Design a protein with these regions (language model features):
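Catalytic cores of alpha/beta
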Residues: 18, 64-76, 114-126, 156-158, ...
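Glycine-rich phosphate-binding active-site loops on the catalytic face of alpha/beta enzymes
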Residues: 78-90, 131-141, 179-203
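Catalytic beta/alpha-barrel core
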Residues: 8, 28-36, 55-63, 79-90, ...
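Alpha-helix-loop-beta-strand connector modules within alpha/beta enzyme cores
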Residues: 37-61, 95-112, 144-170, 201-210
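Glycine/Thr-rich beta-alpha phosphate-binding loop at enzyme active sites
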Residues: 119-151, 160, 199
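Conserved N-terminal beta1-alpha1 strand-loop-helix module at the mouth
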Residues: 1-67, 75, 116, 123-125, ...
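Glycine-rich beta-strand-to-loop/alpha-helix junction loops that act as flexible
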Residues: 31-33, 162-168, 185-190
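Glycine-enriched alpha-helix->loop->beta-strand junction motifs that scaffold or abut catalytic
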Residues: 23-27, 50-54, 75-80, 100-105, ...
Length: 210
């Protein structure tokens, strides 16, 4: 089980400083969609150069032109790139094909997919690397989370690894760990903490205990 730190509301220098605080406790750094919008793929390049030992995920949320966008993110140094589960199979296939060429990984984000079980089955057959249940900011504000959806994909997905994102904090992490996802994605649960390093360290300890 790995920890991914999601960075959304920072610029590149702030991102570098933040990762420095927690780098020994995390496995993947996510360059979130807002950062990509504000800074471009340069953010991926600079974080990968600053922390070559960490995997970098580019949260592009690809909906079309899968092959091309995977190629551009790969050139910037991304190790993992996101595609939306709500897109069509042709886009996912194009993304998977290009990712294999570039020796990169695809994470499919199931945000706003209505029938998680049936869509996860379809996507799992397309050769993606991760399938991720995700409660976005707007639904988190309504008190929702993806813990039940994680159970669904754990029971459904046979080939891809599983991931969960959205609203995970130190006090809710044990519930997530019980489901044994392969990747736990934490944003504000670390970035909003008074002591980011201590929080990330405790999360790593909890995960190690399983």
């Amino acid at each position: 089980m790995e920890i991914q730190l999601a960075l959304d509301l920072v610029n590149i220098p702030e991102a570098i400083e933040l990762v420095k605080e927690v780098e020994q406790y995390i496995d993947v750094v996510e360059i979130g969609t807002p950062v990509v919008i504000n800074e471009g793929l340069r953010a991926v390049k600079e974080i990968k150069e600053a922390f070559p030992q960490l995997k970098v995920l580019a949260d592009l949320k690809i909906m079309d032109a899968g092959g091309y966008e995977i190629m551009k993110a790969s050139e910037a140094g991304a190790d993992i790139i996101t595609v939306l589960g709500a897109t069509d199979d042709a886009t996912i296939k194009g993304a998977v094909e290009e990712a294999k060429k570039q020796k990169k990984k695809i994470l499919v984000d199931m945000i706003n997919v209505k029938d998680i079980e049936s869509r996860a089955k379809e996507i799992d057959a397309l050769g993606v690397d991760y399938i991720c249940v995700h409660t976005g900011y707007d639904l988190q504000a309504e008190g929702k989370n993806s813990f039940e959806e994680l159970t669904t994909i754990k029971n459904t997905v046979k080939n891809a690894k599983t991931a969960i994102a959205g609203g995970i904090k130190l006090d809710t992490l044990p519930e997530v760990i019980q489901q044994k996802p392969d990747l736990v994605i934490v944003g504000g649960g670390i970035t909003s903490a008074a002591d980011k390093a201590e929080t990330a360290s405790k999360m790593k300890q909890l995960i190690a205990q399983g």
